[in-house]
C-alpha cells in the first residue's frame, strides 16, 4: 500500500510539472512583450483608422457616432466632424511624415496617409457628403488651425501631393475665416497659425493677425514656463493644448521665411523664437515631473477630456530633439508610454465602432465641458505620438 501511495504521489507531481510547464508556455506566448514604439504605433492607428477609413470614402458623417456634452451650448453638432479631422491630422502628421518602409508600422503609416489624402479632398469639396463646416459658427477657426498645423508639420507628405483644385479650395477656406474676430485669448494663435500656413503656401496672408498673436503671447508670459490665456491666468492645460506648441510653430514659420513683423528685426524675432523654445523646455520639465511612479498625473482646469493632449509640448520636444539636458530621452519615453498604457487600459475609451468617447479614463460624459464633443478628443488622443515621428534608430 505504501508503494502504491508513493507511486501515486510521484505521478501527481509529474502531472503538475507538465501542466505548469504547458501553462507557463501558453502564458508566455499570449503575453508577448511589444516595444514601446510598436505600442505607440498601434494606438495611433487604432485612434485614427475609424476616422480616416470612413472620411476617405466620404462617409464620416454617415458612420461616426456623434457624442456631445450633457451641457452642450446648442451650437451646430456639425462642428464635431471638423474638430475630429483637424485635431487628428495635426496629431499624427509628424508620424506620417516618415518615409515608407515594409515594416508593420510602415504599412500602417502608408494606409493612414493614403486615407488622409483622400479625406483632405473631401473636407473642402462642397459636393462631398463630408464637406466640413467652414462657413458657419466661430469654432471652424480653431480646427482649421489644426488642419493648417498638419500641413506645416508634414508639408511634403500631406500638402504637396494634393491636386491643385484641392489646394486652392483650402487657401480660399482659410482666407474666408477672416470673417471671425478672435477673442484676446489663445484663439489669436489659431488665426496666426492659419496665416502662417498661407505664408508657407505662397498665398496671400494677413501679417497683422500673426503679429498680434505674437505680441500678445509675449505679454502674457507669467514666468516659470507658463503663459496666461489672455490677461487673466487660468490654471489649466491650455499651455499644452494650444499656446506653447502653436507659438513656437508660428515663430519658426515666420523666421524661416524671413518675414519681418512690425517694429522688429529678424534678429529680434529669432530671439523671440529661441525664448519660446526655452520656455517650452521648462514647461516640458514640469509636465514630466507631474507624472507619478504609478503613471498618473494631476488633472485640473477645463478640457480634462483631452487626455494625452496634456503632454503635447513634451512630445514635441522629443520630436524636435529639444529635450533639456535634465530630461533623459529614455525617461521621457517610458513616462509617456506608461501614462498611455494606464489611460487606455481602462474600458470605455472607445465605442463599438472604434471612435473615442467623452471621458478621461474611460467613458465619463460628466467631465465634458459645454463645448466638448467626441470629435474634440481625437487630436488630443494622438498628440503625444509626435515622438513616434522619430526614426526607430534614434536614441529616443
Give names to the regions the model predicted:
Residues 81, 92-95, 109-280, 289-315, ...:
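Aromatic-lined, polymer-binding surfaces characteristic
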Residues 26-83, 90, 94, 114-119:
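Low-complexity, Ser/Thr/Pro/Gly-enriched N-terminal "stalk/linker" regions
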Residues 284:
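Glycine-rich phosphate/ribose-binding loops and adjacent secondary-structure elements
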Residues 1-29:
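Bacterial Sec-dependent N-terminal signal peptides
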Residues 306, 316-396:
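Extended polysaccharide-engagement surfaces of secreted carbohydrate-active enzymes
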Residues 104-105:
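Long, charge-dense tracts
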Residues 70-75, 101, 129-133, 231, ...:
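Glycine- and acidic
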Amino acid at each position: 500500500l505504501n508503494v502504491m501511495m508513493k507511486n501515486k504521489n510521484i505521478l501527481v507531481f509529474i502531472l503538475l510539472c507538465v501542466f505548469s510547464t504547458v501553462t507557463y508556455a501558453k502564458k508566455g506566448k499570449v503575453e508577448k512583450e511589444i516595444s514601446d514604439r510598436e505600442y505607440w504605433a498601434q494606438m495611433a492607428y487604432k485612434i485614427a483608422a475609424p476616422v480616416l477609413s470612413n472620411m476617405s470614402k466620404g462617409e464620416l458623417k454617415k458612420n461616426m457616432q456623434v457624442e456631445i456634452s450633457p451641457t452642450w451650448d446648442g451650437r451646430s453638432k456639425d462642428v464635431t466632424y471638423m474638430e475630429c479631422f483637424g485635431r487628428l491630422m495635426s496629431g499624427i502628421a509628424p508620424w506620417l511624415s516618415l518615409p515608407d518602409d515594409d515594416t508593420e508600422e510602415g504599412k500602417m503609416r502608408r494606409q493612414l496617409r493614403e486615407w488622409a489624402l483622400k479625406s483632405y479632398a473631401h473636407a473642402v469639396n462642397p459636393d462631398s457628403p463630408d464637406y466640413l463646416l467652414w462657413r458657419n459658427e466661430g469654432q471652424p477657426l480653431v480646427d482649421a488651425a489644426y488642419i493648417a498645423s498638419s500641413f506645416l508639420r508634414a508639408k511634403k507628405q500631406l500638402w504637396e501631393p494634393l491636386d491643385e483644385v484641392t489646394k486652392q479650395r483650402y487657401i480660399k477656406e482659410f482666407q474666408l475665416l477672416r470673417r471671425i474676430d478672435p477673442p484676446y485669448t489663445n484663439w489669436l494663435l489659431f488665426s496666426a497659425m492659419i496665416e502662417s500656413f498661407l505664408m508657407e503656401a505662397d498665398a496671400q496672408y494677413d501679417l497683422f493677425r500673426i503679429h498680434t498673436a505674437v505680441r500678445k503671447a509675449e505679454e502674457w508670459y507669467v514666468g516659470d514656463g507658463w503663459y496666461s490665456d489672455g490677461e487673466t491666468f487660468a490654471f489649466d492645460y491650455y499651455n499644452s493644448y494650444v499656446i506653447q506648441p502653436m507659438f513656437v510653430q508660428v515663430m519658426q514659420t515666420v523666421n524661416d521665411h524671413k518675414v519681418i513683423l512690425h517694429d522688429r528685426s529678424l534678429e529680434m524675432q529669432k530671439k523671440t523664437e529661441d525664448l519660446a523654445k526655452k520656455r517650452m523646455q521648462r514647461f516640458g520639465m514640469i509636465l514630466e515631473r507631474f507624472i507619478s511612479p504609478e503613471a498618473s498625473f494631476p488633472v485640473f482646469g477645463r478640457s480634462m477630456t483631452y487626455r494625452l493632449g496634456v503632454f503635447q509640448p513634451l512630445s514635441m520636444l522629443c520630436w524636435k530633439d529639444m529635450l533639456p539636458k535634465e530630461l533623459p530621452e529614455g525617461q521621457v519615453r517610458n513616462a509617456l508610454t506608461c501614462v498611455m498604457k494606464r489611460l487606455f487600459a481602462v474600458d470605455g475609451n472607445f465605442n463599438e465602432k472604434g471612435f473615442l468617447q467623452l471621458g478621461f479614463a474611460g467613458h465619463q460624459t460628466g467631465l465634458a465641458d459645454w463645448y466638448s464633443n467626441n470629435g474634440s478628443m481625437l487630436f488630443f488622443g494622438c498628440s503625444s505620438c509626435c515622438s513616434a515621428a522619430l526614426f526607430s534608430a534614434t536614441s529616443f
